[in-house]
């Protein structure tokens, strides 16, 4: 513990360097609690982690959430428990294995669920479509097949494809060859959502629709960001690449709420709770004011 008799602020280096932090070690949690009188949990992006500095410390000190966490919770609670309908969910990313639970959870809440990225490839393959050499999770084809039976799910029908000779073309299902690699949804696929987006009152989006790191395969994601920013729907977005798409297009101020979190954003949507928040609920709050969402 640093000597700080005359100081009001104590700054610790990245706590993950300390032994016991990621194991939620009780002794280290107690040591952290000895540094202050009140613990303010304001790291929503880490609220899904049961670590000493996010969960453990709250058992040994008066604790509360900060303003950022309060904003995040109020925003997410609104669209999860009392959203204006109709509601569109959009999920992208490469692996269905990391998002299958959130897909199932969202299907209970939304009117439509548009799926892109590698997740869509696995869903497409489960339905018997050719996807060439595109990223896919073959171990999850059965789960994907069950999901794809839900008529709320919308899959892209045209794609931006890199062919064997490295040329980049737009193709429909019928044109996909065994050596092709699907890297993005086409702008035409986004345009097919125009009527749905224009009728929506609420839109929730997490994850890129293509290989966003390469400029030539970021156009689907960027175009969807533009369309959503121009809609009248209340939009909530989360995840680093999704925020980057809006920020890159100078559209971040056009969304209803931009979450600072990725994993915590998804876990809260799926479960309605997070480990660090559950810990806060379990402790006593002397002289502290909490948001109504807790």
Regions from the language model: what does each represent?
Residues 5-284:
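Active-site loop-to-helix "anion-binding N-cap" substructures in soluble metabolic enzymes
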């Amino acid at each position: 513990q640093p000597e700080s008799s005359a100081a009001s602020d104590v700054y610790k280096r990245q706590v993950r360097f300390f032994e016991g932090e990621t194991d939620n070690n009780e002794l280290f949690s107690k040591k952290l609690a000895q540094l202050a009188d009140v613990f303010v949990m304001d790291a929503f992006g880490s609220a899904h982690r049961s670590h000493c500095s996010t969960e453990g410390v709250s058992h040994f000190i008066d604790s509360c959430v900060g303003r950022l966490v309060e904003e995040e919770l109020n925003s997410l609670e609104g669209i999860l428990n009392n959203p204006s309908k109709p509601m569109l969910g959009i999920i992208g990313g490469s692996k269905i294995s990391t998002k299958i639970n959130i897909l199932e959870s969202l299907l209970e809440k939304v009117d439509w669920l548009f799926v892109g990225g590698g997740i869509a490839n696995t869903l497409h393959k489960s339905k018997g479509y050719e996807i060439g050499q595109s990223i896919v999770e073959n171990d999850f084809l059965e789960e994907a097949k069950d999901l794809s039976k839900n008529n709320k799910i919308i899959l892209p029908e045209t794609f931006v494809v890199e062919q064997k000779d490295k040329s980049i073309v737009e193709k429909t299902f019928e044109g996909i060859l065994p050596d092709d690699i699907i890297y993005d949804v086409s702008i035409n696929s986004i345009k097919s959502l125009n009527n749905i987006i224009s009728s929506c009152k609420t839109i929730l989006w997490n994850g890129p629709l293509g290989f966003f790191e390469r400029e030539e395969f970021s156009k689907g994601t960027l175009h969807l960001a533009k369309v959503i920013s121009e809609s009248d729907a209340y939009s909530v977005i989360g995840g680093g690449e999704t925020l980057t798409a809006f920020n890159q297009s100078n559209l971040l101020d056009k969304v209803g709420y931009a979450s600072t979190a990725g994993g915590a954003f998804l876990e809260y949507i799926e479960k309605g709770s997070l480990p660090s928040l559950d810990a806060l609920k379990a402790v006593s709050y002397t002289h502290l004011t909490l948001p109504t969402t807790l």
